[in-house]
Amino acid sequence: MGQAVSYLTYTLRRCCKKNTLTTESGEVIELDDEHYDTVDLDDLRCSDPLMQPKFVLLKNGRRGKRNREYDNDHEKYVMMFNKE
């Protein structure tokens, strides 16, 4: 399972400028370029899992050509991770 979290971590870093993740306890974690390394996702996986680990909610991030229509809507799930 640590490998899946590592894939999630790698993908967040590569694709997104700012991300918001919600845990099962309701805590909202914002990951951006400045604070990215302060969040230990592997530790979080054991103590307070993410609500929907396959989905990431992008806010003010870069959009691809497919997601152009969502440029002004920051509450869309625009990225889905493959199950591996």
UniProtKB/Swiss-Prot annotation:
Cysteine pairs bridged by disulfides in the record: none
Location of the region described as Asp/Glu-rich (acidic) in the Swiss-Prot/TrEMBL record: 40-46
GO biological process: anatomical structure morphogenesis; viral budding from Golgi membrane
Post-translational modification note: Myristoylation and palmitoylation (probably on one or more of the nearby cysteines at the N-terminus) enable membrane-binding and Golgi apparatus-specific targeting and are essential for efficient packaging. Phosphorylated. Phosphorylation does not seem to be required for recycling to the host Golgi apparatus. Packaging is selective for underphosphorylated forms.
Subcellular location: Virion tegument; Virion membrane; Host cell membrane; Host Golgi apparatus membrane
Alphabetical keyword list: Host cell membrane, Host Golgi apparatus, Host membrane, Lipoprotein, Membrane, Myristate, Palmitate, Phosphoprotein, Virion, Virion tegument
Name recorded for this polypeptide: Cytoplasmic envelopment protein 3
Matches recorded under InterPro entries: Tegument_UL11_Herpesvir
Gene: MDV023
Subunit structure: Interacts with cytoplasmic envelopment protein 2; this interaction is essential for the proper localization of each protein to the assembly complex and thus for the production of infectious virus.
Highest taxon in the source lineage: Viruses
Family the entry assigns: Belongs to the herpesviridae cytoplasmic envelopment protein 3 family.
Lipidation (N-myristoyl glycine): 2
GO cellular component: host cell Golgi membrane; host cell plasma membrane; membrane; viral tegument; virion membrane
Pfam families linked: UL11 (PF11094)
Bilayer topology term: Lipid-anchor
Role according to the record: Plays an important role in the cytoplasmic envelopment of tegument proteins and capsids during the assembly and egress processes. Also participates in viral entry at the fusion step probably by regulating the core fusion machinery.
